[in-house]
């Protein structure tokens, strides 16, 4: 059974039970408040969707060299984001994947809601998982929906840019034009273990494994998102008494 079939079937079943409360539950966390990580970005912690879903094992710390954008390849009609993420947890921890938690560090919903995914991601970088193998050295940001032919909604793109900016600042990643980092792969179907890899600091899943993820429409927007992230990050380089930072011809505002 494919990811889309497994998760979609589970979501359809849950909708029959949740009925009219699905949309409200997707937007209103029951067990915790959103965590404000910047002046413009709040993230719903894992407890808002999975307080009763403990990870199946420990989460190892990660050495973050780049950020990786994914999509769930599920329906773009997502009345209950919380339930969708719970269904993804069920799939990722089932015999189909055997991962300890959801693979992704963060999720972004169509309405711009940002969710913590894998346990520990808000507190510090933790190792993620990915279909096709995990080359390592990344934090995974996953868009809820299928963006093979349809571009993500404006609210989703806005929150994604804010999240990528926050993570780039947090992990000291370069965001200037053509910024890259190198690492030795831990093993994926595109980059076997031991292979030296140079990756854009904001990349798409297909750059690391043989997959269509995050969909052609989303992948085609990566350069736009990188260009929007840079000035947000570059603004943080300016300090009182110092000249604005300049890197690769891109000047901090």
Question: Where would I find each of the regions flagged by the language model?
Answer:
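Basic/polar, cationic surfaces and motifs that engage anionic cell-wall
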Residues: 2, 10-11, 15-20, 27-61, ...
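Short secondary-structure junction motifs
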Residues: 101-103
């Amino acid at each position: 059974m494919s990811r889309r079939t497994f998760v979609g079937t589970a979501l359809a079943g849950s909708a029959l039970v949740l009925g009219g409360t699905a949309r409200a539950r997707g937007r209103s966390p029951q067990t915790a408040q959103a965590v404000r990580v910047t002046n413009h970005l709040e993230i719903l912690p894992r407890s808002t969707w999975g307080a009763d879903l403990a990870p199946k094992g420990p989460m190892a710390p990660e050495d973050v060299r780049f950020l990786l954008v994914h999509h769930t390849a599920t329906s773009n009609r997502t009345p209950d984001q919380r339930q969708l993420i719970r269904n993804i947890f069920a799939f990722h921890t089932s015999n189909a994947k055997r991962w300890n938690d959801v693979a992704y560090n963060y999720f972004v919903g169509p309405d711009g809601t940002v969710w913590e995914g894998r346990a520990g991601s808000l507190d510090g970088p933790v190792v993620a998982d990915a279909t096709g193998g995990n080359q390592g050295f990344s934090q995974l940001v996953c868009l809820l929906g299928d963006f093979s032919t349809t571009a993500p909604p404006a609210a989703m793109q806005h929150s994604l840019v804010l999240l990528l900016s926050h993570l780039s600042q947090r992990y000291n990643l370069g965001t200037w034009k053509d910024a890259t980092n190198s690492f030795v792969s831990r093993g994926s179907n595109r980059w076997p273990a031991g292979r030296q890899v140079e990756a854009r600091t904001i990349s798409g899943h297909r750059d690391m494994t043989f997959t269509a993820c995050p969909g052609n429409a989303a992948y085609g927007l990566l350069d736009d998102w990188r260009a929007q992230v840079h000035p947000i990050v570059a603004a943080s380089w300016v300090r009182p008494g110092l000249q604005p930072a300049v890197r690769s011809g891109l000047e901090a505002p």
